[in-house]
Curated annotation (Swiss-Prot):
UniProt KW Cytoplasm keyword: no
Coiled coil: 1114-1141
Keyword set, alphabetical order: ATP-binding, Coiled coil, Hydrolase, Leucine-rich repeat, NAD, Nucleotide-binding, Plant defense, Repeat
Protein name: Disease resistance protein RPP2A
Family matches, as PANTHER family: DISEASE RESISTANCE PROTEIN RPP2A, LEUCINE-RICH REPEAT-CONTAINING PROTEIN
Function: Disease resistance protein that cooperates with RPP2B to confer resistance to Hyaloperonospora parasitica isolate Cala2.
Amino acid sequence: MAASFCGSRRYDVFPSFSKVDVRRSFLAHLLKELDRRLINTFTDHGMERNLPIDAELLSAIAESRISIVIFSKNYASSTWCLDELVEIHTCYKELAQIVVPVFFNVHPSQVKKQTGEFGKVFGKTCKGKPENRKLRWMQALAAVANIAGYDLQNWPDEAVMIEMVADDVSKKLFKSSNDFSDIVGIEAHLEAMSSILRLKSEKARMVGISGPSGIGKTTIAKALFSKLSPQFHLRAFVTYKRTNQDDYDMKLCWIEKFLSEILGQKDLKVLDLGAVEQSLMHKKVLIILDDVDDLELLKTLVGQTGWFGFGSRIVVITQDRQLLKAHDINLIYEVAFPSAHLALEIFCQSAFGKIYPPSDFRELSVEFAYLAGNLPLDLRVLGLAMKGKHREEWIEMLPRLRNDLDGKFKKTLRNYLPVIRKRVSNEEGGREKLKKGNKKLDLDEEFPGGEIYSDEIPSPTSNWKDTDDFDSGDIIPIIADKSTTIIPNRRHSNDDWCSFCEFLRNRIPPLNPFKCSANDVIDFLRTRQVLGSTEALVDRLIFSSEAFGIKPEENPFRSQAVTSYLKAARDMTREKECILVFSCHDNLDVDETSFIEAISKELHKQGFIPLTYNLLGRENLDEEMLYGSRVGIMILSSSYVSSRQSLDHLVAVMEHWKTTDLVIIPIYFKVRLSDICGLKGRFEAAFLQLHMSLQEDRVQKWKAAMSEIVSIGGHEWTKGSQFILAEEVVRNASLRLYLKSSKNLLGILALLNHSQSTDVEIMGIWGIAGIGKTSIAREIFELHAPHYDFCYFLQDFHLMCQMKRPRQLREDFISKLFGEEKGLGASDVKPSFMRDWFHKKTILLVLDDVSNARDAEAVIGGFGWFSHGHRIILTSRSKQVLVQCKVKKPYEIQKLSDFESFRLCKQYLDGENPVISELISCSSGIPLALKLLVSSVSKQYITNMKDHLQSLRKDPPTQIQEAFRRSFDGLDENEKNIFLDLACFFRGQSKDYAVLLLDACGFFTYMGICELIDESLISLVDNKIEMPIPFQDMGRIIVHEEDEDPCERSRLWDSKDIVDVLTNNSGTEAIEGIFLDASDLTCELSPTVFGKMYNLRLLKFYCSTSGNQCKLTLPHGLDTLPDELSLLHWENYPLVYLPQKFNPVNLVELNMPYSNMEKLWEGKKNLEKLKNIKLSHSRELTDILMLSEALNLEHIDLEGCTSLIDVSMSIPCCGKLVSLNMKDCSRLRSLPSMVDLTTLKLLNLSGCSEFEDIQDFAPNLEEIYLAGTSIRELPLSIRNLTELVTLDLENCERLQEMPSLPVEIIRRT
């Protein structure tokens, strides 16, 4: 077996057997099955086995990945076999070799215990043998027989078992590697490489991977090698460098090493330079040459594809693209720099082990990724350098990165890779590098082998003395690449976000996206304004900037100034979209002239401006026209080759196509694709003539331009089809324009176009009701339908199943498939018949709005009969339905951005309508909702649009109601209740907070939220509940429909309704939740106001505007509160106690800031469920003794409770408290011992001016705030706080001495 990057073994399998029993029967069939699976098996070629085992055989065992031991009756009669077994057992223990025992007509227990017939034979063999040798045999027999294997007695026949053994071995050898699965973006690279390699082709193929150092070429190649190895009998992943100046000797040395590795033959000698071709010309090989910088190496090892057998693939990796060209490698994968969003994921994967940062590191991570640049190596290095560091250390590092304009700091980081790789390994406590959650990062690209590095980081003063980037005492543990090449920050030339970042860096002073203003954005837009495309540019940059981590409310692209600038730009330009129509004709061909006119008319009809551009007879190409268009329709005819000037223009157009986002749509007019591709017919004659009269390089550019056009595909003109073709071409152009601004359609088409499936392709599209799933599916269907033999689009599948039932729909489907004339019914057609009938036909099937997987299977007869060449697209509101329909990765349709919503509004509303921003907000990016709302407010008779919009929210258009109702009605009672609580009370709240409270109400909240997400009714954004406003409105409408009288509804949120219920004392047991915004409200409540609300679970009286107070008074006191309450949130509670009758047995959160309470209540209460208590700024509070009963408390907030003096008996002595905030408790003097509070992370005593004594610290504290206290000394236990990151001692004027702290704690704090 060839050597690879993951360790070299000469053989895949070593078989150990007794030739007396199995060589001609069982073994022969097994070897045949292994060979059929391309498994490299050692064969002894008739080696005599009655001699002592020789060194060659021992070497073969040690250099095999798997040993198959075939125990048979006479296996133990051979000392050779037994000695083999001892060696195999040794390799099993010491080299982790895989051993597969096979029991051929012998029972495993006989082998293990050496009994029965097997034991008799073994006993004879042992006679006269040394005891130590017999002992080794017995130990090996017992150990190997104890390994799970295959017993022929348990199988119906040999053939079945042999096939299973071969399959098992194949899986063990070629199991999919996890080394690369966690590398961000690797799948996209592998898909791109697969399309270049064309693995289905039997023709040998040589391709290149090019890109700068650190871009990830080697990592991509290693992942590719891991993925493709099972398909090749011989494979090798090698890196060679010149070590000898003598060309001939160096080449022989290269060949010897190369053939030794790929053929698995040690010390192989070659005599001439033709050995590679002679040895491999009939072999199917996979060869990857890494880090190539010598053209002679390529000529020597992979001179031509003809040197290798059919199906071979050779991949050459280099930084030098010209080296590939010089070796005639034209299929080159140029590794692109990652987008800003992908760069952030790469950085986070290294820093946090996941592709997104923790919430408190989000902004820091975004800026670090931005400052690291776009080179994957630098992103990984910096991420690993920051791995495990505390937030304060990140903040300290920022100035160095911001000032690192020349890359000196990053270069320093990259110079210590081996040192820090070992540090990280040690920090992970010896865990396996590939263990789940600890991604193995491959940063070895272009890393020279053989160097030896110290395990200690050199002194900063000695190694960084030439830079002022470090203080003398800094020790920076980092992982980096030893490469000394630093590539400047570059991205694709057509990457708008990169261009914007570059623009900011060139400002004076330099800026970054977090520090720029709206004026900076406008200045950038002025540099990029071309023919009205500025709006689309802003739309893309809004998406990129927010993917980069900028909050929408802080995004300068969304500012009023930028919006005003866009309006002014629209008023100045007012151009429609221009589409270029290229041709090369002399007006003598009537058909071509007529066709161009048909295209122009169709473009006008669709609202575009056609710019017809004849390349014939033009001296110069109009570059301004090129840059003013996003789509070019190119009519290719034989006239092109009659004009050298036209061909030069064609080259220029294709160069422009490669460097911009221009879309080219070729139309082959009276020429065939094969003529241009193979330069046949008139093209062949013309180019032969041009070859004779012109420079070769000019002709080669023309050929390259022709090849590039052919690679795009396009449409072929046929006589009589010009009008149909014109419509199809313009529809394609329109769709391509839409693609450039529609991330949804673009994403789906990218998935379809890169699909390499050898089986049926089943794609799923899911999203909320009204998001546009049907429209997108229809566009895809119309775009792809011409390429299929049979196409079927079944719209409104859910509705059709209700109207016709699945059986009738199946009859319709069968009749469409086979045609009415065949007279076949559903009962006549079995899946096997369907499979055979359509095996060689292509099928495109779209099922729109599927709500039940069983119905879908019933209509189409299951998914099993579909095969390669068949594509099924399903849309659904439910992700789980798509998964049940065998969709592997459902594509979620994203909501419209604000800019897309704005453009849609402008199609209906003229001028600056005052309600546009409210329309955009109320629609939540749902196209259906936005269209219906905009259409409604655009009617002329409406005088007050804002009032009309509010009425629409209370009574939405029928289509919105129907779309929502169907999703809601399909939920179970648990999910319905959770949804209504979220809609009425928890939209925008933390998911964990909602789960905490609603679980206490008896709901299965986490499961319910997951189901609501799958049903597209809610989503999570930064772990917060996100719900489209139309859905929230509908949820509240459902509650409103429970009863006309608010007192009989389950949930109340409207202040008017709530005040009516409370002041009239009309509450009933129907009410389960009340959330009242009491800003600017003043009212008196009765003592029995909650007397009949037995089922009230959630109660919240609050003020949403700062400066206001909740003025709900209880002049006659309060008799009771409902015992079902899990949330009691009452700001400015007016009484000194809670009702004595109140039993808080279900209470989870007590939130009563700014209350008048002196104590909660008299006596003890059951506080088992209480998790959070907030009594902040309750200035009269003196007694919290009852909290000692709350053993599950996690958060206590008593900030500003200025009357609290002694809490020594009040803090619960349990290990569940996480935070204790007693800031500004100015009379507090001491705290109890905290040694048992093992989960306490935060202690805040700042502003406790009389606080003097602290006995000890909780052992796992991370944050301690003691600013402004009167403490005189700190307890010695502070030295043991290994998790401490913040220690605030500001203005501790009485502090006399402080224990000496470990260096680690000082550095963290």
